[in-house]
Amino acid sequence: MNEQIGKSIEELRAYNKSLERSPEYQRILPEVMWEVNTQFVKEIIAQEERWLSYKVEEEPIEDDDPIIVEFFKTLRADLKAQDELRKKRIEEAKELLPTDPARAAELLSKLGSCHTLWALQKRILKEKYGITWYTPAELNPDVKFD
């Protein structure tokens, strides 16, 4: 049973602050973050590779309006260029992952990634160490994090 149920946000913040300052938490944090970043990178790589498995249509664009035709040609070219950048980022992240998962995670992070990282951290702390930890989003419900 979670001993923090029914506590105010201020009490939960104090709990987290105390937890994060504890020697035990400080001792395990590097290992936890290694695992968080490793899992994050693996998840993002899997998502990106699924995206890359979809092919950009190569069939001719049939439209009487030359502006529409040019728009779709440009869109295709942009998608192909983005895919090349995506492939490069994936390869770089794969190279970094065994020795520097934090750098690999930074390379693949985008808007909203903090929520995924926090969820992983929360889960790992709970499952592996039995520690209840609250994310910044949980402790600051009126703040929008990206």
For every predicted segment, state its role.
Residues E10, A14-K17, W34, T38:
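Extended, non-membrane alpha-helical segments enriched in charged/polar residues
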Residues K144-D146:
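Short acidic DE-rich linear segments
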Residues N2-L12:
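Short amphipathic alpha-helical heptad-repeat segments
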Residues V36-E91, P98-K128, T132-T135:
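Acidic, low-complexity, intrinsically disordered interaction modules
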